[in-house]
Amino acid sequence: MGRGNRHSVTKIYYTDDIGFILPAKTLILTRFMITKPTSYKPISGNDLPRFAGIATFMRLPYVAPADADEVEIGLIGVPWDGGTTNRAGARHGPRQIRDLSTMARNVHHASGIKPFELCRCADLGDTPVNPVDIEDTLGRIQAFYNEVVNQGIVPLSAGGDHLITLPVMRALCRAQPVGMVHFDAHTDTLDRYFGESKYTHGTPFRRAIEEGLLDPKRTVQIGIRGALYSDRDKEWGLEQGIRVIEIEEYNDLGVDAVIAEARRVVGAGPTYISFDVDVLDPVYAPGTGTPEIGGITTYDAQLLIRGLRGLNLIGADVVEVSPPFDMSGNTALVAVTLMFEILCVLAEAASAES
């Protein structure tokens, strides 16, 4: 083509591998006019290098929630850490997790599950947030998830601090309280911080129980450890009926027995998975807001998630990745790997239900 040709053309390949011939100056506009992909498969690292392209969760197509009526599992970022009381930075978690998720592939090596064959999956983008107003942000996040839930999409979220789970549950658990498998170093059932603050990353599950979103008798917390402010930090949840497996009991029981106990507690009812990366020993996940030594290993975490296959799962999150404290990127890579583990379990459950 001549240098002076104003109508020179460029061939561009989208995630569906269909090429479009368009005037070069219209490429950007046209890209954002496309609302639905023709394929919900991720881009292969054999077709586009992992360091190239625009980062989406697991290299899936981006679909706005308003256009996501075909999507069955939506991966969502919640870039907010306004509930953090110690080391901030989890607001940057979704971006870093997206970047590292280029390492994800299509087939689970142990189970053989192919989540992208079982379900239509997409990156639904980030929720809107207000970094200077907690309650406004909670409302914005809930409104985003209301749209997701109303379309029957199963959400898999990346935080963000652990307070983000509360507005997700407000959208997801409106019909009835649900059970939960909660991996964490902390119970997150405190009442208030600094006398007045009801909404922090240490209070979401107390609020969820009070609001009738979470059934404490169908809730199991795994990996709890670390010093307390007072005895009441632990006692309130136990009084509500939460099954708390502290790290000492975890080590005594072993992974298989912990899985069996978790399955017994949640039963056959609708169940949510919430995974705080600080359940892991900081050797494996240093990039988090409230690290506690003596945690579980990454391999144990993988086995625990695989042990939830067959449950009635309605959604999940992975939270508290703080990139400013994750110099090597290992914590984000761990989060990506665990999100893929959870995605496989969710996809199997969703496909069985359909």
What residue ranges belong to the model's regions?
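N-terminal amphipathic/basic-hydrophobic helices that include classical n-h-c signal peptides
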Residues: 1-32
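Active-site environment of divalent metal-dependent phosphoester hydrolases
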Residues: 189-190, 227-229, 323-325
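Residues at secondary-structure transition points
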Residues: 8-12, 23-25, 165-166, 208, ...
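Short helix/loop capping segments that flank catalytic or ligand/cofactor-binding pockets
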Residues: 84-86, 191, 230
